[in-house]
Design a protein with these regions (language model features):
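P-loop NTPase motor domains
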Residues: 1-180
Length: 180
């Protein structure tokens, strides 16, 4: 089931933040920028999803985290002012200056953006490529709301012999978050 079909921008942001690798010391500033970036992107994407302009999935999120696409998303004409302000503020934490062409942005912008973007590379790659058949489905077969409301038994199998413990933990977090 695609956990990004439903849910608020904040809930989906927290789902992705929970998959970030731990950072400490000097790297915590980059982790903070990564959280700001994914928050801004999720507010914009959820806004477009709720307007029926796109079906949100892990591949859409991963594609939207490319520098040029993220800037284009910040300038999307269909965004609400709040969503636009959120993603533009997130880009601003990496040095983006609104109103300037990409070629006129500060040289450090692309570098700082890349650091923030890299925090989600592994998780989104895993969800989009390895588990596309599960999390990439636009309309999944499992209705988690029905399972909860009708008190049905739902079993999620994790490939414990085939994956590293950290990968299994990520899959478990995603499954639990999808149920919420």
């Amino acid at each position: 089931n695609n956990p990004f079909t439903f849910g608020s921008a904040e809930a989906l942001t927290q789902l992705l933040v929970s998959l970030m690798p731990a950072s400490d010391g000097a790297n915590s500033i980059f982790a903070d920028k990564a959280q700001a970036l994914i928050s801004g992107v999720m507010y914009a994407l959820v806004d477009l999803r709720d307007k029926g302009l796109l079906k949100l999935s892990t591949s859409i999120i991963r594609d939207s985290l490319a520098l040029e696409k993220c800037v284009a998303l910040a300038l999307h004409p269909e965004l609400d002012e709040e969503s636009r302000a959120s993603i533009q503020a997130a880009l601003g934490t990496s040095g983006w200056i609104a109103g300037r062409e990409m070629k006129d942005q500060p040289p450090s912008f692309a570098e700082q953006f890349g650091y923030a973007q890299s925090y989600f590379g592994k998780a989104l790659s895993s969800l989009t490529d390895t588990y596309r058949h599960i999390y990439g489905a636009e309309d999944g077969e499992v209705d988690f709301a029905d399972a909860i409301m009708q008190r049905r038994i739902l079993v999620v199998l994790l490939p414990s012999l085939e994956k590293a413990p950290a990968e299994l933990a990520s899959l478990g977090k995603i499954s639990l978050s999808a149920i919420r």
